[in-house]
């Protein structure tokens, strides 16, 4: 074997996936790159290693830096990192080349897939928890008739809008396969339109919350003048023509992929996104005025109605940024940095999926009227069952002495 070193090199190159002919061409190319360099003294000659990296002619004692190979042995590598090789003091190259920084792009793709799958799990978990919490809140508002004022009816409708949005989200996730996207069938476009409609209703019912508080606190109108049908028109009615206009625009200008996403240069999605941003900004203005009034005029007031207004404002102050932040995140570019993209994906997935949970907590579970009504129901149920127990015991008391006396009489008769 020692007589055939060239044969060993050919076998090594073939094992590494390199053609011996191409290797000789690489040597010639590497030599040509080194011709322009003017180096005096002891030096290492231009050389191509077994991986195929060209190490140009370099002075002795220098650590030479070269980009990682773009492709080796069927695997792509990140060329932004470097490999290192030392030109020894005796004018020969070090046998070992440091490729420790060279990372497989395949690994980076695997990491991206892992983050994507985790984000999907967060989305499913958040929407499940939100849907359960929203359904519980819906049932509470349905059963507790004693608290049915206009303010709580608005809360109830907001919760209903979130339930329908979460439900259509699950329909989208379970039915929209890549094949369905490509086919662009009619039913999948209807599902997308329904999801976007309920998405818009979320914002318009939040707008209804802001309108109610602004009218009651800032404009100091009596809430008795406000009618339920006004808010139903705002929350359920106004979004409908907006989505119809969007659907017509999609049908004529972007009729593909079940109306999800958008083509470059086509702005039909702004037909419904624009009104959402507008009502969001108006709500911020409403809240600014409401907080200003509460901080000045109503600070000293301790009436129960004012306390309820304050609690409603606190809930809206928390929920509105949650709704707004998640929506505005779609317009933010997370950048090319991996950490930024991962934080963006997880943060957006969490807020997007847990919105319904936060709505049910702040507008129902922490609502003092709801909690008070539940306590009354619970005490009434306890009293009812305790009365039944007392009545049952009272009815059983007379029978016991009768049996005893009859038994004693029977015994005395027998004697």
From Swiss-Prot:
C-terminal Ser or Thr residues may be phosphorylated. Residues 280-290 are annotated as: Important for antagonist binding. Disulfide bonds join 30-54, 44-87, 68-102, 188-258. Residues 1-23 form the signal peptide. GO terms for biological process: adenylate cyclase-activating G protein-coupled receptor signaling pathway; cell surface receptor signaling pathway; cellular response to corticotropin-releasing hormone stimulus; corticotropin secretion; regulation of corticosterone secretion. One of its GO terms (molecular function) is corticotrophin-releasing factor receptor activity. It is found in: Cell membrane; Endosome. Glycans are attached at residues 38, 78, 98. The chain crosses the membrane at residues 112-142, 150-174, 190-218, 226-253, 270-295, 307-331, 339-368. CDD domains: 7tmB1_CRF-R1 (cd15445). SUPFAM superfamilies: Family A G protein-coupled receptor-like, Hormone receptor domain. The keyword Cell membrane applies. Expressed abundantly in the pituitary, cerebral cortex, hippocampus, amygdala and cerebellum. It is a multi-pass membrane protein. The transmembrane domain is composed of seven transmembrane helices that are arranged in V-shape. Transmembrane helix 7 assumes a sharply kinked structure. Belongs to the G-protein coupled receptor 2 family. Heterodimer; heterodimerizes with GPER1. Interacts (via N-terminal extracellular domain) with CRH and UCN. Interacts with DLG1; this inhibits endocytosis of CRHR1 after agonist binding. This is Corticotropin-releasing factor receptor 1. The lineage of its organism: Eukaryota, Metazoa, Chordata, Craniata, Vertebrata.
């Amino acid at each position: 074997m020692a007589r055939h070193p060239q044969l060993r090199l050919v076998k090594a190159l073939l094992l590494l996936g390199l053609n011996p002919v191409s290797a000789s061409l690489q040597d010639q190319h590497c030599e040509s790159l080194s011709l322009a360099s003017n180096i005096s003294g002891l030096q290492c000659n231009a050389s191509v290693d077994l991986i195929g990296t060209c190490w140009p002619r370099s002075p002795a004692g220098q650590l030479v830096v070269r980009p990682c190979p773009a492709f080796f042995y069927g695997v792509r590598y990140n060329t932004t990192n470097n490999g290192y090789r030392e030109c020894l003091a005796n004018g020969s190259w070090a046998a070992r080349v440091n490729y420790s920084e060279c990372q497989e792009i395949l690994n980076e793709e695997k990491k991206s897939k892992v983050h994507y799958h985790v984000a999907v799990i967060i989305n499913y978990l958040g929407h499940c928890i939100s849907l359960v919490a929203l359904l519980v809140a819906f049932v509470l508002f349905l059963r507790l008739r004693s608290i049915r004022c206009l303010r709580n009816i608005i809360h109830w409708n907001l919760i209903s809008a979130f339930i329908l949005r979460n439900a259509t989200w699950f329909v989208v996730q379970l039915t929209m396969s890549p094949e369905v996207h490509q086919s662009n069938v009619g039913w999948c476009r209807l599902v997308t339109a329904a999801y976007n409609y309920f998405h818009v209703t979320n914002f318009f019912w939040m707008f209804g919350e802001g309108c109610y508080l602004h009218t009651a606190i800032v404009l100091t109108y009596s809430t008795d003048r406000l009618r339920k049908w006004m808010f139903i028109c705002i929350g359920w009615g106004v979004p409908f023509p907006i989505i119809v206009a969007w659907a017509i625009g999609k049908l004529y200008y972007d009729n593909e992929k079940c109306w999800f996403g958008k083509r470059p240069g086509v702005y039909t999605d702004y037909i419904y996104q624009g009104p959402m941003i507008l009502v969001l900004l108006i709500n911020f203005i409403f809240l600014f005025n409401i907080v200003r009034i509460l901080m000045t005029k109503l600070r000293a007031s301790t009436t129960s109605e004012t306390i309820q207004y304050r609690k409603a404002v606190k809930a809206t102050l928390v929920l509105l940024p949650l709704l707004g932040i998640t929506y505005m995140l779609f317009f933010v570019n997370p950048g090319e940095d991996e950490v930024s993209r991962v934080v963006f994906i997880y943060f957006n997935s969490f807020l997007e999926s847990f919105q319904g949970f936060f709505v049910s907590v702040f507008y129902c579970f922490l609502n003092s009227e709801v909690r008070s009504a539940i306590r009354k129901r619970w005490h009434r149920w306890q009293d009812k069952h305790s009365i039944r127990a007392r009545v049952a015991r009272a009815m059983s008391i007379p029978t016991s002495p009768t049996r005893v006396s009859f038994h004693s009489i029977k015994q005395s008769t027998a004697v």
